[in-house]
C-alpha cells in the first residue's frame, strides 16, 4: 500500500493498494489497520479515527472480488461507497509510432482513451481530494458532509491497472517524469516487476497527451524494460 496524495486541510487522503478482499470476504478491519500503519510508518501521518472510505475498484465485471465489494458497501453504506472504473489498458505503445501519427492519436483521446477514460478520471480523483464541494454525490450513498475521506484505488495485485491510474496522477499532478513513474510502479511491491504491458501502454499515451497539450517537458520516449 502507498499514499498517492493528501489534503490535510480537508482531511482527505488518496491511497493505492491491492484488493481488500481476502478469503471471499471484504477485509474491512485489515484495510483500516494497514491504512493506519502505512500512513504513520511510511509518511508520518496519523489518520483520523473515523473516516469514510471511497473504494475505487479497477476490477473487471467478471472478477468475483468486485461482487464482494458491491455487497459489502450495500450492506454497510455508513462505512463507505464503491466506485467502479473498468480499466483495460491499450494494445499499442505510443512511443512505437512515428511522431506525426502519435501526436494525432494522442490529441484525439477517443483513439486511445475511449475505455479507460484517464483524461476524465484522473482529474476526478484530484478534484475529490482538493475541491471541497466535489464529494456531494457521496451524500446520497451514506456519506455525512465534513467526515474525513480515504480514497483507496486498487485492482487485484495493486500494480498494473492501479499503476496505470496512479501513474497518470503522478505525471499530471505531482509532475513526476515518466521514468520516475515507471520505476516507482515497478517497485511498489516487495518483488519488483514491470507493470503489465497493456497498462504501461495506456500510461505512455497519457504521458504523450500531457507532452503535446500541457507543454511541460516529459521523457515519454524513454522506457524501462517492458517485460
Regions from the language model: what does each represent?
Residues 1-152, 156-157, 164-227:
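Cys-dependent protein tyrosine phosphatase-like superfamily
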Amino acid at each position: 500500500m502507498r499514499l498517492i496524495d493528501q489534503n490535510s486541510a480537508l482531511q482527505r487522503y488518496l491511497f493505492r493498494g491491492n484488493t481488500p478482499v481476502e478469503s471471499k470476504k471484504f477485509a474491512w478491519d485489515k484495510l483500516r489497520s494497514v491504512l493506519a500503519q502505512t500512513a504513520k510508518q511510511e509518511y508520518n501521518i496519523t489518520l483520523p479515527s473515523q473516516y469514510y472510505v471511497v473504494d475505487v475498484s479497477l476490477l473487471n465485471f467478471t472478477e468475483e472480488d468486485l461482487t464482494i465489494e458491491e455487497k459489502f458497501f450495500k450492506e454497510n453504506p455508513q462505512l463507505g461507497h464503491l466506485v467502479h472504473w473498468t480499466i483495460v489498458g491499450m494494445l499499442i505503445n505510443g512511443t512505437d509510432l512515428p511522431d506525426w501519427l502519435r501526436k494525432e492519436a494522442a490529441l484525439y483521446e477517443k483513439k486511445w482513451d475511449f475505455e479507460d477514460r484517464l483524461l476524465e478520471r484522473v482529474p476526478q480523483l484530484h478534484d475529490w481530494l482538493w475541491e471541497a464541494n466535489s464529494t456531494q454525490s457521496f451524500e446520497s450513498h451514506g456519506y455525512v458532509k465534513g467526515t474525513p475521506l480515504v480514497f483507496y484505488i486498487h485492482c487485484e495485485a495493486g500494480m498494473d491497472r492501479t499503476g496505470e491510474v496512479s501513474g497518470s496522477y503522478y505525471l499530471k499532478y505531482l509532475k513526476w517524469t515518466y521514468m520516475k513513474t515507471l520505476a516507482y510502479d515497478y517497485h511498489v511491491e516487495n518483488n519488483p516487476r514491470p507493470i503489465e504491458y497493456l497498462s504501461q501502454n495506456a500510461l505512455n499515451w497519457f504521458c504523450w497527451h500531457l507532452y503535446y497539450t500541457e507543454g511541460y517537458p516529459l521523457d515519454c520516449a524513454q522506457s524501462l524494460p517492458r517485460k
